[in-house]
């Protein structure tokens, strides 16, 4: 079964979303930032992208459900006014429609047709004007069929996309008609690998990463970047292994932090599992509650890396 229509829609709305976030970033971000209960920053860009994306999905596939990160329960009115200003450049939605559109992302996931959105993954990177990504995936019963990542600050702006069974492509953020096929690296030895991880120490256990890379005899320093841009780096051969290491087993990864990147790496010939080598299960709701941490790789290095990761993290509770 083809999902060409879903892929075309995802590419189009991620491209526009990159324009929205770039526009927001051109303004001073300090007064546009809000701190959520989990202490991660939320920007006008997050809400603006979610409003726009949800509206476009709902127009085209009105019966589909959307699992997205943000909601409007605590959005201050001054922030919301800025959201409306940015959204209305690209949409004719009224203010009340924008609020309703943001809250279309409240699905609990699971069975059926679902879109999975992280409007700005790597908000701290966005605020630093470094790496962030607009992340959109489409799944049926937890099986990812389409994944698109927009990375506006990566090498002048890139979009990577995949449809299950059709490989992965990379586009300029300004041209989604002419993509080129991408593939993971063929690096055969861990001693030669380029390893990437999150910038923020709250997102991964960097001290354990250091132990793991020493065990694997990695000679290159880690490449640290925010967001699912790391999946893009693996899929395009710019890096060989990505580790996201939990500090304890109580933390549950959110599906919007991984859905698009997971498919793109796999379609580029790589492998993505949790730290125990188990496939990721997106069918259980808004979190990967049956998985712990992430290992993504070019496939060649996967088994050796996972074995060392399991050993180093064997005391996790």
Curated annotation (Swiss-Prot):
InterPro entries: Inositol_monoP_metal-BS, Inositol_monoP_superfamily, Inositol_monophosphatase-like, Inositol_monophosphatase_CS
Protein family (similarity comment): Belongs to the inositol monophosphatase superfamily.
Catalysed conversion reaction: adenosine 3',5'-bisphosphate + H2O = AMP + phosphate; 1D-myo-inositol 1,4-bisphosphate + H2O = 1D-myo-inositol 4-phosphate + phosphate
Protein name per UniProt: 3',5'-bisphosphate nucleotidase
GO cellular component labels: cytoplasm
Signal peptide span: none
Residues annotated as binding Mg(2+) 3: 69
UniProt-recorded Gene Ontology molecular function terms: 3'(2'),5'-bisphosphate nucleotidase activity; inositol-1,4-bisphosphate 1-phosphatase activity; magnesium ion binding; nucleotide binding
Record text on activity regulation: Inhibited by Li(2+).
Example GO biological process: phosphatidylinositol phosphate biosynthetic process
Cofactor detail note: Binds 3 Mg(2+) ions per subunit. Active also with Mn(2+) or Co(2+).
Keyword Chloroplast: no
């Amino acid at each position: 079964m083809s999902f060409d229509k879903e892929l075309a829609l995802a590419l189009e709305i991620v491209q526009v979303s990159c324009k929205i976030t770039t526009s927001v970033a051109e303004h001073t971000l300090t007064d546009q930032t809000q701190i959520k209960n989990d202490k991660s920053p939320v920007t006008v860009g997050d809400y603006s992208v979610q409003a726009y994306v949800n509206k476009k999905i709902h127009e085209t596939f009105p019966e589909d459900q959307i699992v997205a990160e943000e909601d409007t329960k605590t959005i201050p009115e001054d922030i919301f006014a800025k959201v409306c200003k940015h959204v209305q450049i690209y949409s004719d939605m009224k203010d009340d429609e924008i609020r309703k559109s943001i809250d279309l992302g409240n699905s609990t996931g699971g069975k059926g047709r679902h879109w999975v959105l992280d409007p700005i993954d790597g908000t701290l990177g966005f605020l630093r004007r470094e790496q962030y990504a607009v992340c959109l995936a489409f799944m049926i019963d937890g099986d990812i069929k389409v994944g698109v990542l927009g990375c506006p600050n990566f090498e002048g702006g890139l979009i990577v996309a995949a449809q299950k069974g059709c490989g992965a492509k990379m586009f300029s953020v300004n041209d989604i008609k002419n993509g080129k096929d991408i593939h993971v690296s063929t690096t055969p030895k861990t001693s030669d690998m380029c390893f990437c991880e999150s910038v923020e120490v709250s997102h991964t256990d960097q001290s354990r990463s250091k132990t793991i890379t020493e065990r694997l005899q990695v000679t290159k320093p880690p490449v640290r970047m925010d967001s699912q841009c790391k999946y893009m780096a693996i899929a395009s051969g710019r890096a060989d292994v990505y580790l996201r290491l939990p500090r304890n087993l109580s933390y549950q990864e959110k599906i919007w932090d991984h859905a698009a990147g997971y498919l793109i790496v796999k379609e580029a010939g790589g492998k993505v599992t949790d730290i125990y080598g188990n496939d990721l299960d997106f069918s259980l709701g808004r979190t990967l509650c049956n998985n712990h941490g992430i290992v993504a790789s070019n496939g060649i290095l996967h088994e050796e890396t996972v074995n060392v990761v399991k050993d180093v993290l064997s005391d996790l509770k």
